A protein has these predicted regions:
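Structural preference for beta-rich elements and adjacent junctions enriched in aromatics
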Residues: 1-274, 283
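Outer-membrane beta-barrel translocator/channel fold
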Residues: 21-24, 160-197, 286-301, 316-372, ...
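Outer-membrane beta-barrel translocator domains and adjoining extracellular loop/strand segments
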Residues: 22-25, 86-87, 128-132, 164-168, ...
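Residues on the lipid-exposed face of transmembrane beta-strands in outer-membrane beta-barrel proteins
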Residues: 107, 119, 138-142, 239-243, ...
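Exposed, low-structure sequence patches enriched in small/polar residues
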Residues: 234, 318-458
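Transmembrane beta-strands of outer-membrane beta-barrel pores
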Residues: 14, 56, 79, 121-127, ...
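Short loop/turn motifs that connect adjacent beta-strands in outer-membrane beta-barrel proteins
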Residues: 59-69, 107-114, 147, 247, ...
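Membrane-embedded beta-strand positions of outer-membrane beta-barrel proteins
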Residues: 52, 119, 140, 152, ...
Length: 458
C-alpha cells in the first residue's frame, strides 16, 4: 500500500527454489508467511534470468480509487559466488530503515477477488484394535478485493504440517517455535505484536491446538486418563477476518478447540486495530483465552506505537497488561534508534515486566519479573577502495544490565562482534564478551531455599 506498514519479499534461486517473508517495523523479518505465487529461472551461456508471477490477490491491499496506485518496491540480485548484492534502491533488509527507504512506484490499479476452498477427507484404521477414524473438513480463503479478507477453517486437519526441530532445553526459558500451519501464517501480519529478540509475542498461534488441560484426579479412571494424555488438541473451528482502510486496519481472530474424554477444549479470541499514518502508527490488541475445563479465563491488552516523524530517528514502544482470576500484570518496552547514515546506528532501550505479567495462555513471554537496560552501537562500512582486500565490515557493541523487579542485579555485560568480509570470499568473525559479578535467578527458578546463584566476574 506504499505506507511502510508491511513489506513482502519474494525470492527465487537458480534451482527454482522459492522463499518468501514479511517485513515490519523497519526490518523485522518473519519467514512464517507462505504466499501463493510462482517463479522460474532460465540459465543461458553466460547469464541467467528470472521471471516472477505474483497474483494481485497474493496479499490484502487497501481499496484505491482511480486508474493508478502507489506501492514501494525494490529489486535485488544476490551473486552467491562473490557474496555480493545489487539493489535497485540503496538499502537492504539488514538496515533498520529497510522498508522506509524503498522507492515509490506507480503502477496500474486493478481490483480482483479470489475465493479458494480446500476440502479434505481422511480415514485411518488401526489393524490391532480395529478402530476406525474418519475426519472431514474444509479450509476457506476469501479475498474480497476491497481490502478485506476472511479465512475460515472448519474441523481442520494439520497432520501434513512439518514437525519442529528437536531441541533439548534444560533451562527455565521456554523454547519458542515458529508457526507452520498455513491457516495461521496466511494474512496474519496485522496481529504480529512482538518484542525484539523474541522477548514476547502477544499472540503465539502455536498455543492454539496445544496440549489440552488435564486434571486426572477428577476422574475415577485416573489411570486411563494418565495413559491417554495428548500433546495436541484438535480444532472445531478457526476464523480470521481483516479489513484494511486508508486510515485504519481492523482484525478479528477466533478459534475453538475440540472436547475429548478427559478434557474440554479452549476458546481463543483476539481483536486488533491499527492506524495507517506513514510516520506515526498506533495499534491496540486485545486477546481472551477461555479454559472450559478449569472454568478460567485470561485477558491481555497491548498498546503499540511506531514513530518515524523525527528525522533519522525511529521510536517504538509497547504497553502490556494481563489479567487473570487472581492477578494483574503490567509490562513496558521502549526503544529509540538513531540512524544518521548507513554507517552508524545507536539503539537505546528499556523494558519492564513485573512478576505478575503473564502472556502465555495465547502469547509468549520469555520471562517476567525483569527490568532491562541496553545500548547497542553499530558501525558498518560497505565500500572500500579498489586496492583494498576488504569488501565490508560490520561491527557492533552491546551494553546491558538486567535485574529482577525487587532489585537482584544480574551481571552487567558488554558484548562486541566484528564481521570482516574480504573480496576473496574469505570471512572473519571476531567476538568478545565481559561480565561483572551479579545474581542469576534463572538457574534456580527462584526456589525459595536458593533464590539465586552468585555469578563471579568473567
Amino acid at each position: 500500500d506504499g505506507n511502510s506498514k508491511v513489506a513482502y519479499g519474494f525470492t527465487v534461486s537458480l534451482g527454482d527454489s522459492l522463499a518468501d517473508a514479511t517485513y515490519t517495523n523497519g526490518n523485522s523479518e518473519s519467514k512464517d508467511w507462505d504466499g501463493d505465487w510462482i517463479a522460474r529461472t532460465f540459465k543461458g551461456n553466460n547469464f541467467w534470468s528470472s521471471e516472477f508471477f505474483i497474483p494481485w490477490t497474493v496479499v490484502p491491499m487497501q481499496k484505491v480509487d482511480g486508474p493508478k496506485r502507489n506501492v514501494k518496491f525494490i529489486a535485488f540480485r544476490w551473486l552467491a559466488s562473490d557474496e555480493f548484492g545489487f539493489g535497485s534502491t540503496k538499502t537492504n533488509w539488514e538496515r533498520e530503515t529497510f522498508i522506509y527507504d524503498l522507492e515509490d512506484l506507480v503502477i496500474d490499479n486493478y481490483q480482483s477477488k479470489k475465493y479458494s476452498y480446500f476440502p479434505y477427507l481422511t480415514v485411518a484404521e488401526d489393524s490391532v484394535t480395529n478402530e476406525s477414524i474418519q475426519k472431514a473438513g474444509i479450509d476457506i480463503f476469501l479475498n474480497h478485493g476491497d481490502g478485506s479478507q476472511t479465512n475460515i477453517a472448519i474441523n481442520p486437519d494439520f497432520g501434513q504440517v512439518e514437525t519442529d526441530q528437536v531441541v533439548v532445553n534444560f533451562s527455565a526459558i521456554e523454547t519458542f517455535f515458529s508457526e507452520k500451519r498455513a491457516f495461521f501464517t496466511e494474512n496474519h501480519s496485522l496481529f504480529e505484536v512482538k518484542g525484539g529478540r523474541d522477548d514476547f509475542y502477544v499472540i503465539n498461534t502455536r498455543r492454539i491446538g496445544g496440549r489440552p488441560d488435564y486434571d486426572c484426579s477428577r476422574f475415577e479412571q485416573s489411570d486411563i486418563c494418565e495413559n491417554n494424555r495428548k500433546e495436541y488438541s484438535d480444532l472445531d473451528l478457526a476464523l480470521r477476518h481483516t479489513i484494511q482502510k486508508e486510515k485504519v486496519d481492523l482484525g478479528f481472530l477466533a478459534a475453538s478447540e475440540s472436547d475429548e474424554n478427559f478434557s474440554k477444549g479452549r476458546d481463543y479470541f483476539a481483536f486488533r486495530v491499527r492506524s495507517n499514518s506513514p510516520q506515526n502508527k498506533v495499534g491496540f490488541l486485545a486477546t481472551k483465552t477461555k479454559s472450559n475445563f478449569f472454568n478460567e479465563s485470561s485477558d491481555v491488552y497491548s498498546l503499540d506505537i511506531e514513530n518515524t516523524a523525527v528525522k533519522n530517528t525511529q521510536i517504538s514502544g509497547y504497553l502490556l497488561n494481563s489479567r487473570k482470576e487472581n492477578s494483574t500484570g503490567h509490562g513496558l518496552r521502549f526503544d529509540i534508534k538513531y540512524i544518521p547514515n548507513d554507517k552508524y546506528e545507536n539503539t537505546v532501550g528499556f523494558h519492564y515486566f513485573d512478576k505478575d505479567l503473564d502472556l502465555n495462555d495465547m502469547g509468549y513471554l520469555q520471562r517476567n519479573d525483569q527490568i532491562k537496560f541496553y545500548n547497542r552501537f553499530e558501525f558498518d562500512r560497505n565500500s572500500y577502495p579498489k586496492e583494498s582486500l576488504l569488501r565490508s565490515r560490520d561491527s557492533h557493541i552491546s551494553i546491558f544490565q538486567t535485574m529482577t523487579t525487587d532489585g537482584k542485579k544480574s551481571p552487567k555485560g558488554v558484548w562486541t562482534k566484528t564481521e570482516l568480509s574480504f573480496k576473496s570470499n574469505f570471512n572473519i568473525d571476531l567476538s568478545m564478551s565481559a561480565k561483572t559479578e551479579g545474581k542469576d535467578t534463572n538457574i534456580t527458578r527462584k526456589y525459595i531455599g536458593s533464590p539465586y546463584i552468585q555469578i563471579m566476574d568473567e
